């Protein structure tokens, strides 16, 4: 949906909506992020129960990322003919179905089917969530609405992994996934009662399909920036996906202590998202370069000092502080280089991020199973270093700076 269509929708009184509707979308965002990364905290019991390796269990994140890529690229053509409320309700229902399928999966194949379904929801929801929030409130309240929706995302990054690990020890990994179903049902009922009917607006000329979205890559500096962000997320998730087995097999952390370490990562990440805006305002590209450099250093140090629990907790806290806040910077970059096509650029960025998560978690899993954690962490560091170099090239390119 184009900016012109959104402006028309915002001017339509019957689509003014309510803050309750925005809150409903925020709850949906929380459940979705929790669903996406819940396997990170439950890889070991999932692998043991399904009779597979931890690396193969980690492919549940890879497949969700792959399907999110496809959905984010093609959702605009589908959304153009569907009422936005209907589409959101359908995606929310599918999220609940995914949690149930994974929780009841009798084998690895069904587990992967459930993860593929959540990938479809991820791609569809994030590609249209901002545009939908913009239709629910007056124009001057849009920033607050978007912050509220992203607040659900930020909250999930804090509590999802440690809560998942704790629930896994309490009621098993299947019970942890099953807990997502009532949350999805609450979000579904909330959206059903609070969201107004949101008819698809007239499609204005511009990047409205997958082919013209790819044309954005021809703009100066855009390809470099997308490659830099892609390698950043690949490096991040090739390591982060396998934090739990690393903690258990190398650091010697088990049970509830795993939950505490994951809570440290999430809490540090939440703090990072609160602080990053000020840092970006002062030194934008310097910050985007420094983050992957620091994370690469952390990955390398973990290969040497991974057996020291106190040091590992501090290092992973720094990893969460920097890694969770980095997407804020890259979204700000999107706004800079696509001032007139922010929605199309955002859709392309969603595809890049999800593809990178899929590739990173896949590569990390293959290395973890075949050669051990050190190869995984070395690969992560290498990708992060290349990301930093490409970010420097992006800063020196002729991309618009807003």
UniProtKB/Swiss-Prot annotation:
Membrane topology reported for the UniProt record: Multi-pass membrane protein
Annotated keywords: Cell membrane, Membrane, Transcription, Transcription regulation, Transmembrane, Transmembrane helix
Ranges that cross the membrane: 22-42, 60-80, 86-106, 108-128, 147-167, 170-190, 220-240, 256-276, 296-316, 318-338, 348-368, 375-395
Compartments reported by the entry: Cell membrane
GO cellular component: plasma membrane
InterPro entries attached to this UniProt entry: MFS, MFS_dom, MFS_Efflux_Transporters, MFS_trans_sf
BP term (GO), one: transmembrane transport
Cross-referenced Pfam families: MFS_1
Domain of life according to the entry: Bacteria
Primary subcellular site in the record, as a coarse category: membrane
GO terms assigned for molecular function: transmembrane transporter activity
Family designation: To B.subtilis YwfA.
Function of the protein: Regulates the expression of oprD which encodes the imipenem-specific porin.
Protein known as: Transcription regulatory protein OpdE
Species in which this protein is naturally found: Pseudomonas aeruginosa (strain ATCC 15692 / DSM 22644 / CIP 104116 / JCM 14847 / LMG 12228 / 1C / PRS 101 / PAO1)
Lineage: Bacteria, Pseudomonadati, Pseudomonadota, Gammaproteobacteria, Pseudomonadales
């Amino acid at each position: 949906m184009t900016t012109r269509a959104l402006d028309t929708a915002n001017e339509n009184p019957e689509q003014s909506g309510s803050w309750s509707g925005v809150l409903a979308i925020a709850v949906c965002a929380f459940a979705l992020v929790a669903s996406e990364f819940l396997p990170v905290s439950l890889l070991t019991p999932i692998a043991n129960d399904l009779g597979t390796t931890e690396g193969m269990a980690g492919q549940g994140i890879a497949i969700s990322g792959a399907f999110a890529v496809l959905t984010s690229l093609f959702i605009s053509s589908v959304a153009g003919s569907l009422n936005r409320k209907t589409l959101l309700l359908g995606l929310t229902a599918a999220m609940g179905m995914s949690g149930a399928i994974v929780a009841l999966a009798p084998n690895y194949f069904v587990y992967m089917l459930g993860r593929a379904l959540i990938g479809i929801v991820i791609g569809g929801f994030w590609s249209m969530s901002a545009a939908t929030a913009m239709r629910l409130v007056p124009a001057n309240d849009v920033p607050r609405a978007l912050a509220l929706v992203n607040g659900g995302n930020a909250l999930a990054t804090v509590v999802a992994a440690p809560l998942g690990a704790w629930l896994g020890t309490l009621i098993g990994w299947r019970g942890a996934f099953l807990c997502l179903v009532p949350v999805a049902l609450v979000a579904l009922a909330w959206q059903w009662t609070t969201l107004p009917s949101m008819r698809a607006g007239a499609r204005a000329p511009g990047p409205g399909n997958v082919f013209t979205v790819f044309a954005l890559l021809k703009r100066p500096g855009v390809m470099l920036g997308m490659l830099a962000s892609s390698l950043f997320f690949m490096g991040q998730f090739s390591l982060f996906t396998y934090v739990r087995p690393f903690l258990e097999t190398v650091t010697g952390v088990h049970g509830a202590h795993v939950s505490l370490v994951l809570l440290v990562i999430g809490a540090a990440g939440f703090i990072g998202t609160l602080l990053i805006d000020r840092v970006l305002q002062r030194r934008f590209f310097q910050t985007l370069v420094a983050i992957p450099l620091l994370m690469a250093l952390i990955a390398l140090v973990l290969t040497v000092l991974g057996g020291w629990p106190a040091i590992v907790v501090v290092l992973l806290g720094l990893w969460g502080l920097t890694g969770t806040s980095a997407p804020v910077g890259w979204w700000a970059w999107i706004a800079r280089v696509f001032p007139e096509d922010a929605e199309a650029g955002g859709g392309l960025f969603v595809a890049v991020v999800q593809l990178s998560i899929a590739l990173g978690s896949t590569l990390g899993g293959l290395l973890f199973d075949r050669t051990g954690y050190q190869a995984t962490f070395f690969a992560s560091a290498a990708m992060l270093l290349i990301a930093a170099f490409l970010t420097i090239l992006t800063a020196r390119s002729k991309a618009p700076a807003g």
